[in-house]
UniProtKB/Swiss-Prot annotation:
Keyword set includes Nucleus: yes
Composition bias type Low complexity, residue spans: 69-87
PROSITE patterns (alphabetical): OVATE
Keywords noted in UniProt: Nucleus, Repressor, Transcription, Transcription regulation
Summary of the tissues where the protein is detected: Expressed in roots, rosette and cauline leaves, shoots, stems, flower buds and siliques.
Protein name: Transcription repressor OFP16
Region span, Disordered: 63-91, 111-131
InterPro entries: Ovate, Ovate_C
Disruption phenotype: No visible phenotype under normal growth conditions.
Tagged with keyword Transcription: yes
Subcellular localization, as worded in the UniProt entry: Nucleus
Residues forming coiled coils: none
GO biological process: negative regulation of DNA-templated transcription
Amino acid sequence: MPKILWKSLHLCFPSNLTKCYSSPCIPPSSADPDGIIQPNRPSIVLLNNFNLLYHNDNHHHPHRVIDLPSSSTTTTPAATSSSSTSSYESDISPDVSAAFASRRFFFSSPGRSNAITDSPEPRSREFSDNYDDATITSTKKKKKKVYDNSVTTTTTRLISGGTAVTQHVDSPDPLTDFRRSMQEMIDAAIDAGELSRDPNDGYDFLDELLLTYLSLNPADTHKFVIRAFSDILVSLLSEERRIC
């Protein structure tokens, strides 16, 4: 019974597997030196077909030649590596040559920054414009005539035991400041009792007050001193309390 099953085993496989793929078929003469086929020995074709079902020849023979119906192709590891290397070089060479020709990463001279591209200069121009505007403004301010008013707050003649103090004030309206300062000096002298209502004493005080303001202030402010003194004199003459 086992012999019958073994002989009929090849009928379970397709007929196209009868072709030998791994090695050429051995003729009957080379299978047995005496030329006699033993009935109990399975045929070589059957064993080869059985091995093809359970063994992956591609794993053991990765570069085995396979016969195709139309044409035959032979591949070798050396040829594969050389072809892949040449294709890799052909793909990389144009990119490298193009990058080198464009001189993208090469600089002829050092710049003000480490950036690849030149940075715009709107901020520097803005700073220079602001600096120019500030310079023009300061020049205009210097050209504008600002008067340095020296105001005497007290004198030894008007208040006994005091000292003369000079105060430097930059005023946009020198005439008003001189008039107010002179009025304060006259009021302080009257309140302190240093200034009497004697007309002669009044003239002497006003004369000394005018000369003091003219001597303590620069020449370009004398016109404001005289105008302020004239206003004070007119106001004193119009008041009920006259010192002249």
